[in-house]
Every structure is written in structure tokens, then in C-alpha cells.
Regions:
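GST superfamily/GST-like fold recognition
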Residues: 140, 197-223, 231-236
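GST-like domain detector, emphasizing the conserved glutathione-binding G-site
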Residues: 46-172, 176-182, 191-193, 197, ...
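Carbohydrate-binding/catalytic loop surfaces
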Residues: 164-167, 256-264
Length: 264
């Protein structure tokens, strides 16, 4: 039997305009023969099993947190595997778990995806969080690549072993690179005028930029607008708009257990 809501959709598929809301259930056996095929297609679509998702990353926000938030926004469950860094570098890195030898990876019914921004782009399309059209999707990808550059800049500076070079690299990142990119984000938001980076609704471009700024300035906390953003009015208003999205706010208030502090 098919429930009331699905039956209304089914009546459109079978072009039976005389069907009313009183027809709340139907047996496949009772349908005319010519309607069985679209009915079968409909049933397959609505009963298709959700893929099994397994995300593997270190116990950090880092490059996986935007993926976690994307799952939260979509309301989709996934296995969040927190990989012990020592075990990764001594055993797992060359075990074949990750084809690229890097994390994060996302397993989708056994198929392994690598590169965090490619994973985000895939999930956005799956969860209706991608912008409309190829041009807007390219704009979203561009913003994701900007964030990837910021992450790389911070990671390289933070991981520098020479103390003087590390201090210089971190100073350049915090005083020059990040403010410059915040100015870039400000210009895009001011030009769009719809409250989000692309179009009129939340997309993965908003998620990836927000996650980086929240992780860098607020260490993943749910509190209000970071001081470092307050000189950018459009960016500040956008940050608060995204932060207070119910599912994002809930995720920020309930971070993954086992996280260790990191630069972002």
C-alpha cells in the first residue's frame, strides 16, 4: 500500500485526474495494466535504499568539518570514523585505505572518494545543496578552492618546524592572507544581495566558507559573530544567518566527541 502523500504523486504519474484525496491507499493488483509500469518506477524511486556513508578523518575539525556539517544540514546519518594520527602514519597511510594516502575519505557503499572539496561537491548534488546550473556550480567550486588555499596556508605555517619561519608564516596568514580573503568574501556577498553567496538559498559554498571561518575564529563554538569579521558588514550578517540555521546551530552545540584543538 502507498500512503496518502505518495498516492497524490502517483495519480500524476498515471494521469488519473479523477483520483481524489479520499483515495489514501491502493494495491498494485487493483491498478489497470497500463499503469503498472509507471507505478513500478515510482515504487522503486521511493523505496530505494539510502547509501551507506562512512567518513574517515583525524579527531579534528580541519578539512572534514564542512562534510560533517553538510550531513547535519541534510539530516543524513553517516559513520564518523575518528582515525588515530599515530596509527594512521605508522600503519594505515600505506594500507590502501585511502587511494591518495590522505584523509579525509568518504566511502559510499564501498566506493572511496578522496579530496574534501570533491566530497563536498558530490554530497551537495546528492542532498540538494548545490547551486542551479553549471555556472553557479563553478562559482561554488571556486569559493571552495579559495577555502582550500586558506587551509593549506594555515597548515603549512602551523606545521613549520623552524620556530622563526613558523612565527612569520602564521603572522602572514593571520594579518594578511585571511583578512584579504574576508574582503573578497565581503565583495561577493555585497554583490549578490540575496543573503547567501550564490542564489537565494543555502548551498555548500556557504557551508564550506562558514565552517572555515567558524573553525578558525571560534574553534567550532556556537557563539555569535567573531571579532575578526565585524569590520565586514555583509560577511558578518551572512555569518549570523548561516550560524543560526537550526541544523547548523544544533551541530555546533553538539560537536563530535574526541576532537583535539587545532589551528582551524
Amino acid at each position: 500500500h502507498i500512503n496518502h502523500a505518495n498516492w497524490l504523486c502517483l495519480s500524476l504519474l498515471t494521469r488519473e485526474g479523477h483520483i481524489t484525496s479520499h483515495h489514501i491507499s491502493v494495491s498494485i493488483e487493483s491498478k489497470p495494466r497500463h499503469t503498472l509500469r509507471p507505478l513500478a518506477v515510482f515504487v522503486r524511486i521511493f523505496t530505494r535504499a539510502m547509501p551507506k556513508y562512512k567518513l574517515s578523518y583525524f579527531p579534528l575539525r580541519g578539512r572534514a568539518e564542512a562534510i560533517r556539517i553538510t550531513f547535519a544540514v541534510a539530516g543524513v546519518e553517516f559513520d564518523d570514523i575518528l582515525v588515530n594520527p599515530e596509527e594512521w602514519f605508522t600503519k594505515l597511510k600505506h594500507s590502501g585505505l585511502s587511494p591518495s594516502g590522505q584523509l579525509p575519505i568518504l566511502e559510499v557503499d564501498g566506493t572511496v572518494l578522496t579530496q574534501s572539496k570533491a566530497i563536498l561537491s558530490y554530497l551537495a548534488k546528492e542532498f540538494n545543496l548545490a547551486p542551479k546550473g553549471n555556472l553557479q556550480q563553478a562559482q561554488a567550486d571556486s569559493l571552495a578552492h579559495v577555502v582550500n588555499e586558506l587551509e593549506t596556508t594555515l597548515t603549512e605555517a602551523y606545521g613549520e618546524k623552524d620556530p622563526e619561519r613558523k612565527e612569520k608564516g602564521m603572522k602572514t596568514a593571520t594579518e594578511e592572507v585571511i583578512p584579504d580573503k574576508c574582503g573578497y568574501f565581503e565583495k561577493i556577498l555585497s554583490a549578490n544581495k540575496n543573503g547567501f553567496f550564490i542564489g537565494e538559498k543555502l548551498t555548500y559554498a556557504d557551508i564550506v566558507v562558514f565552517t572555515f571561518l567558524n573553525s578558525y575564529f571560534m574553534k567550532g563554538k556556537a557563539e555569535g559573530i567573531p571579532e575578526g569579521l565585524k569590520k565586514f558588514p555583509s560577511l558578518s550578517a551572512w555569518y549570523e544567518r548561516v550560524r543560526t540555521q537550526p541544523k547548523i546551530l544544533e551541530k555546533l552545540k553538539n560537536p563530535t566527541d574526541g576532537f583535539v584543538d587545532y589551528i582551524y
